[in-house]
A protein has these predicted regions:
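N-terminal signal peptide c-region/cleavage motif recognized by signal peptidases
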Residues: 13-17
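N-terminal helix-cap/turn-to-beta initiation motif at the start of protein domains
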Residues: 19-25, 134-138
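Core segments of small alpha/beta cavity-forming domains
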Residues: 21-81
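Surface-exposed, charged secondary-structure patches
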Residues: 56-128, 184-190
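Hydrophobic/aromatic beta-strand elements that line small-molecule binding cavities or substrate pockets
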Residues: 101-104, 132-139
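Low-complexity, intrinsically disordered terminal/linker segments enriched in charged
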Residues: 110-115, 121-132, 140, 145-190
Length: 190
Protein backbone atom coordinates (compact mmCIF):
# COMPACT_ATOMS: atom_id res chain seq x y z
CA UNK A 1 0.00 0.00 0.00
CA UNK A 2 2.76 2.44 0.94
CA UNK A 3 4.61 1.60 -2.29
CA UNK A 4 1.48 2.39 -4.31
CA UNK A 5 1.06 5.71 -2.49
CA UNK A 6 4.72 6.57 -3.03
CA UNK A 7 4.41 5.79 -6.74
CA UNK A 8 1.26 7.92 -7.00
CA UNK A 9 2.99 10.79 -5.18
CA UNK A 10 6.00 10.51 -7.47
CA UNK A 11 3.78 10.67 -10.55
CA UNK A 12 2.12 13.81 -9.20
CA UNK A 13 5.49 15.40 -8.45
CA UNK A 14 7.18 14.52 -11.77
CA UNK A 15 5.68 17.51 -13.60
CA UNK A 16 6.87 19.76 -10.76
CA UNK A 17 10.37 18.31 -11.07
CA UNK A 18 10.43 18.86 -14.81
CA UNK A 19 9.30 22.47 -14.37
CA UNK A 20 11.48 23.26 -11.34
CA UNK A 21 12.90 26.63 -12.24
CA UNK A 22 15.02 27.10 -9.16
CA UNK A 23 17.28 25.08 -6.88
CA UNK A 24 14.75 25.61 -4.07
CA UNK A 25 11.90 24.09 -6.09
CA UNK A 26 14.03 21.08 -6.99
CA UNK A 27 15.02 20.49 -3.36
CA UNK A 28 11.49 20.93 -2.06
CA UNK A 29 10.05 18.47 -4.62
CA UNK A 30 12.86 15.94 -4.08
CA UNK A 31 12.61 15.89 -0.29
CA UNK A 32 8.80 15.85 -0.37
CA UNK A 33 9.09 12.63 -2.36
CA UNK A 34 11.95 11.31 -0.21
CA UNK A 35 10.17 11.87 3.11
CA UNK A 36 6.96 10.26 1.78
CA UNK A 37 8.76 7.19 0.42
CA UNK A 38 9.68 4.03 2.28
CA UNK A 39 13.09 3.95 0.58
CA UNK A 40 16.01 2.90 2.74
CA UNK A 41 19.57 2.30 1.59
CA UNK A 42 20.41 2.46 -2.10
CA UNK A 43 17.31 2.95 -4.26
CA UNK A 44 15.83 -0.07 -6.00
CA UNK A 45 14.40 -0.23 -9.56
CA UNK A 46 11.24 1.88 -9.34
CA UNK A 47 12.74 4.18 -6.72
CA UNK A 48 15.69 4.92 -9.00
CA UNK A 49 13.30 5.77 -11.85
CA UNK A 50 11.32 8.07 -9.57
CA UNK A 51 14.50 9.87 -8.46
CA UNK A 52 15.65 10.55 -12.03
CA UNK A 53 14.03 14.02 -12.39
CA UNK A 54 15.81 15.38 -9.33
CA UNK A 55 19.29 13.84 -9.41
CA UNK A 56 22.29 14.49 -11.63
CA UNK A 57 23.58 11.89 -14.07
CA UNK A 58 26.71 10.94 -12.08
CA UNK A 59 24.84 10.64 -8.78
CA UNK A 60 22.16 8.44 -10.39
CA UNK A 61 24.88 6.22 -11.84
CA UNK A 62 26.62 5.91 -8.45
CA UNK A 63 23.34 5.05 -6.72
CA UNK A 64 22.55 2.41 -9.33
CA UNK A 65 26.02 0.90 -8.83
CA UNK A 66 25.50 0.94 -5.04
CA UNK A 67 22.31 -1.05 -5.54
CA UNK A 68 24.15 -3.54 -7.74
CA UNK A 69 26.89 -3.94 -5.10
CA UNK A 70 24.24 -4.43 -2.39
CA UNK A 71 22.48 -7.11 -4.46
CA UNK A 72 25.73 -8.95 -5.27
CA UNK A 73 26.82 -8.91 -1.63
CA UNK A 74 23.41 -10.19 -0.47
CA UNK A 75 23.56 -13.06 -2.97
CA UNK A 76 27.20 -13.99 -2.33
CA UNK A 77 27.14 -13.63 1.47
CA UNK A 78 23.54 -14.21 2.63
CA UNK A 79 24.53 -14.39 6.32
CA UNK A 80 26.14 -10.93 6.27
CA UNK A 81 24.59 -7.50 6.07
CA UNK A 82 25.31 -6.07 2.62
CA UNK A 83 26.41 -2.48 2.04
CA UNK A 84 23.77 0.13 1.19
CA UNK A 85 20.92 -2.04 2.47
CA UNK A 86 19.45 0.44 4.93
CA UNK A 87 19.57 3.99 6.20
CA UNK A 88 18.93 7.34 4.59
CA UNK A 89 21.63 8.22 2.07
CA UNK A 90 20.24 11.72 1.51
CA UNK A 91 20.87 13.13 5.00
CA UNK A 92 23.35 12.78 7.84
CA UNK A 93 20.93 10.93 10.09
CA UNK A 94 20.39 7.19 9.55
CA UNK A 95 16.61 7.37 10.12
CA UNK A 96 16.22 10.35 7.79
CA UNK A 97 14.26 13.57 8.19
CA UNK A 98 10.55 14.08 8.74
CA UNK A 99 10.50 17.81 8.10
CA UNK A 100 12.57 20.25 6.04
CA UNK A 101 13.04 24.00 5.96
CA UNK A 102 15.31 25.60 3.43
CA UNK A 103 18.06 27.89 4.61
CA UNK A 104 20.44 30.09 2.65
CA UNK A 105 20.79 29.55 -1.09
CA UNK A 106 23.88 30.55 -3.02
CA UNK A 107 23.83 30.41 -6.78
CA UNK A 108 26.51 31.12 -9.38
CA UNK A 109 27.29 30.05 -12.92
CA UNK A 110 24.83 27.17 -13.17
CA UNK A 111 25.62 25.79 -9.71
CA UNK A 112 23.87 26.24 -6.37
CA UNK A 113 24.16 25.28 -2.72
CA UNK A 114 21.07 25.03 -0.52
CA UNK A 115 21.22 24.80 3.26
CA UNK A 116 18.86 22.08 4.51
CA UNK A 117 17.40 22.35 8.01
CA UNK A 118 15.95 19.01 9.00
CA UNK A 119 13.86 17.79 11.93
CA UNK A 120 12.89 14.32 13.10
CA UNK A 121 10.77 13.22 16.03
CA UNK A 122 12.77 11.10 18.46
CA UNK A 123 10.19 9.69 20.85
CA UNK A 124 12.67 10.56 23.61
CA UNK A 125 14.08 13.66 25.25
CA UNK A 126 14.48 16.03 23.56
CA UNK A 127 11.44 15.11 21.46
CA UNK A 128 12.77 16.67 18.24
CA UNK A 129 16.24 16.26 16.75
CA UNK A 130 17.40 19.07 14.47
CA UNK A 131 20.34 19.10 12.10
CA UNK A 132 21.61 20.80 8.96
CA UNK A 133 23.08 19.42 5.76
CA UNK A 134 23.76 21.08 2.42
CA UNK A 135 22.61 20.10 -1.06
CA UNK A 136 24.73 20.94 -4.08
CA UNK A 137 22.92 21.40 -7.38
CA UNK A 138 23.85 22.02 -10.99
CA UNK A 139 22.02 22.73 -14.21
CA UNK A 140 21.94 19.64 -16.42
CA UNK A 141 19.92 19.54 -19.61
CA UNK A 142 18.16 22.77 -18.72
CA UNK A 143 17.00 21.79 -15.23
CA UNK A 144 18.32 21.97 -11.68
CA UNK A 145 19.44 18.59 -10.28
CA UNK A 146 21.03 17.47 -7.02
CA UNK A 147 24.64 16.41 -7.56
CA UNK A 148 25.74 15.89 -3.95
CA UNK A 149 24.69 16.11 -0.31
CA UNK A 150 27.19 17.37 2.25
CA UNK A 151 26.57 15.67 5.59
CA UNK A 152 27.01 18.26 8.33
CA UNK A 153 25.42 16.76 11.43
CA UNK A 154 27.83 15.45 13.99
CA UNK A 155 26.15 12.15 14.79
CA UNK A 156 27.88 8.98 15.87
CA UNK A 157 25.76 6.59 13.80
CA UNK A 158 25.12 8.43 10.58
CA UNK A 159 26.65 9.61 7.35
CA UNK A 160 29.80 11.72 7.31
CA UNK A 161 31.56 13.68 4.58
CA UNK A 162 29.47 13.79 1.42
CA UNK A 163 27.22 11.39 -0.47
CA UNK A 164 29.28 11.16 -3.69
CA UNK A 165 32.52 10.74 -1.76
CA UNK A 166 31.00 7.91 0.33
CA UNK A 167 29.62 6.15 -2.74
CA UNK A 168 32.90 6.46 -4.66
CA UNK A 169 34.94 5.09 -1.75
CA UNK A 170 32.70 2.02 -1.42
CA UNK A 171 32.31 1.32 -5.13
CA UNK A 172 35.82 1.82 -6.46
CA UNK A 173 37.73 -1.19 -5.04
CA UNK A 174 37.27 -4.54 -6.74
CA UNK A 175 35.95 -7.44 -4.64
CA UNK A 176 36.58 -10.87 -6.19
CA UNK A 177 34.37 -12.60 -3.58
CA UNK A 178 31.41 -10.64 -4.94
CA UNK A 179 32.57 -10.72 -8.55
CA UNK A 180 32.63 -6.92 -8.24
CA UNK A 181 34.98 -5.33 -10.79
CA UNK A 182 35.28 -2.02 -8.94
CA UNK A 183 35.91 1.15 -10.93
CA UNK A 184 32.20 2.04 -10.81
CA UNK A 185 33.03 5.54 -9.62
CA UNK A 186 35.38 6.05 -12.56
CA UNK A 187 32.76 4.74 -14.98
CA UNK A 188 30.07 7.04 -13.52
CA UNK A 189 32.28 10.13 -13.75
CA UNK A 190 32.56 9.80 -17.54
Amino acid sequence: MRAALTTALALLLLPAAALASSPQQTIEAFYRWRMASAMTGAPRGDELKQLRPWLGRELLCLLQAAGELRDRAAAAQPDEKPPFVEGDLFSSVFEGPQRLRLGAVTQRAGQAAVELRFEADTGAQPPVFRWSDRALLRREQGRWVVVDIEYRARVEFGNHGALRESLRAALEPADPALNWPGEAATRCAR
